[in-house]
Curated annotation (Swiss-Prot):
The lineage of its organism: Eukaryota, Metazoa, Chordata, Craniata, Vertebrata. The gene is Ppox. One of its GO terms (cellular component) is mitochondrial inner membrane. It comes from Mus musculus. Keywords: FAD, Flavoprotein, Heme biosynthesis, Membrane, Mitochondrion, Mitochondrion inner membrane, Oxidoreductase, Porphyrin biosynthesis. It is a peripheral membrane protein. Belongs to the protoporphyrinogen/coproporphyrinogen oxidase family. Protoporphyrinogen oxidase subfamily. Catalyzes the 6-electron oxidation of protoporphyrinogen-IX to form protoporphyrin-IX. This is Protoporphyrinogen oxidase. Coiled coil: none annotated. Pathway: Porphyrin-containing compound metabolism; protoporphyrin-IX biosynthesis; protoporphyrin-IX from protoporphyrinogen-IX: step 1/1. Transmembrane segments: none annotated.
Length: 477
């Protein structure tokens, strides 16, 4: 009888793991278990009555690098090529990003000319920060905060404005707590290998082999900065779900796992309330802190490690305006914590993907609120209600973008514990977890955003790697 592998979690990581498990030469029986009623995790797209698409989670995927190429290959394999909406390299959403500082939108400098010119909010041309960086010695610590790393190598302004904002945009987190080694491994490795970030990025880490397809070649030729799908990004997990169902994968949704136990013969028993399943191996693609509550007593040391990987909550407010215009054209803007801790940034959805504006076309923007700073709002006595988030989002859109008329449509969603925080020393937690799994020969593989990347590409790759580890061979991709 063949092996049975249970995949916990029907987000994009669990779906990708299941997809690659069944592509091996001798695929196991795969059972995907999801606690909620829907699959796709944080990727969720809602279509308005006018046909406009509102993304409640991720809204674009980067095609760059080996991981970006692998995701595009997946899109082709699922037959979604005709649905792809690219943002080409010459598009304003690819070229223009802004910081909101001192009550003003400032374009981030790009290209050599931009680096040589004074570019507010920075007091000097960023060329000087780059020159300073080239002359700095290599750091000696095995890890440090993003803020400390950026301040040491690039100066206080880049640290407190650019890197602070970037951490808020990517992780909804505090650069003074997040780990440079785990959050931005390419920057950490560049310094370790070449003594300089700039030298490291220029010389590169060597080209890793990349998959090839007509879509990948097109993305490269047209220098895509990101892409989406015509019906919204949720089309991707939906297509994966349909593919899995067609290949005989058992998909159980609305089935929260109550506990995991090891049988005497080494198989897993997965308790689902009033029923249970058995498996030879488990791939866990649920958050680390959730898995820590399910593990049996034999895995208590692992549970303790996983319970320390925390996540923050983000309020996402989608706003739609009739007959309104943006003061600038670009991807969006970020807000450093020194300016407005509550507002992380605003994405200009209609600039990147006007095809999703509906009929008649409208202006769509998305305001991100909270993250690490949500706990401070709560501590200050604020009731974290949809009304509060809508008010804060509309005020931000009015103040920062001049959108003073009330929106014609508004969606408010609080995503609880949606973005894991790789705080300083995160790499040691991962090392300890892997050492425990290896030493105990536990038939458990970890995947998902809790470990080595929170972006969609990272999650898809973590699912693929988990499947490869279980199969003991590369899947057919």
């Amino acid at each position: 009888m063949g092996r049975t592998v249970i995949v916990l979690g029907g987000g994009i990581s669990g779906l990708a793991a299941s997809y690659h498990l069944i592509r091996g030469p001798s695929p196991p029986k795969v059972i995907l278990v999801e606690g909620s009623k829907r699959l796709g995790g944080w990727i969720r797209s809602i279509r308005g009555s006018d046909g406009a698409i509102f993304e409640l989670g991720p809204r674009g995927i980067r095609p760059a690098g080996a991981l970006g190429a692998r995701t595009l290959l997946l899109v082709s394999e699922l037959g979604l090529e005709s649905e792809v909406l690219p943002v080409r390299g010459d598009h304003p959403a690819a070229q223009n990003r802004f910081l909101y500082v001192g009550g003003t939108l400032h374009p981030l400098p790009s290209g050599l000319r931009g680096l040589l010119r004074p570019s507010p909010p920075f007091s000097k041309p960023l060329f000087w920060a780059g020159l300073r960086e080239l002359l700095k010695p290599r750091g000696k610590e095995p890890d440090e905060t993003v803020h400390s790393f950026a301040q040491r190598r690039l100066g206080p302004e880049v640290a407190s404005l650019a890197m602070d904002s970037l951490c808020r945009g990517v992780f909804a987190g505090n650069s003074r707590e997040l780990s440079i080694r785990s959050c931005f491994p390419s920057l950490f490795q560049a310094e370790q290998t070449h003594r300089s970030i700039l030298l490291g990025l220029l010389l590169g880490a060597g080209q890793s082999p990349q998959p090839d397809s007509s879509l990948i070649r097109q993305a490269r030729a047209e220098r895509w900065s990101q892409w989406s799908l015509r019906g919204g990004l949720e089309v991707l997990p939906q297509a994966l779900h349909n593919h899995l169902a067609s290949k005989g994968v058992t998909v159980l949704s609305g089935q929260p796992v109550c506990g995991l136990s090891l049988q005497p013969e080494g198989r897993w028993k997965v308790s689902l309330g009033d029923s249970s399943l058995e498996a030879d191996h488990i791939i866990s693609a649920i958050p680390a802190s959730e898995l820590s509550k399910l593990l049996p007593a034999e895995a208590a040391p692992l549970a303790r490690i996983l319970s320390t990987i925390k996540a923050v909550s983000v309020a996402v407010v989608n706003l739609q305006y009739r007959g309104a215009c943006l003061p600038v054209q670009g991807f969006g803007h970020l807000v450093p914590s020194s300016e407005d801790p509550t507002v992380l940034g605003i994405v200009y959805d209609s600039v990147a993907f006007p095809e999703q504006d509906g009929n008649p076309p409208s202006l769509r923007v998305t305001v991100m609120l909270g993250g690490y700073w949500l706990q401070k709002l709560k501590a200050a006595g604020h009731q974290l209600s949809p009304e509060l988030f809508q008010q804060q989002a509309q005020e931000a859109a009015a103040t920062q973008l001049g959108l003073k008329e009330p929106p014609s449509h508004c969606l408010v969603h609080l995503h609880k514990n949606c973005i894991p925080q790789y705080t300083i020393g995160h790499w040691q937690k991962l090392d300890s977890a892997m050492q425990f799994l290896t030493a105990q020969r536990l038939p458990l593989t970890l995947a998902g955003a809790s470990y080595e990347g929170v972006a969609v590409n990272d999650c898809i790759e973590s699912g693929r790697q988990a499947a490869v580890a279980v199969l003991g061979t590369e899947s057919n991709s």
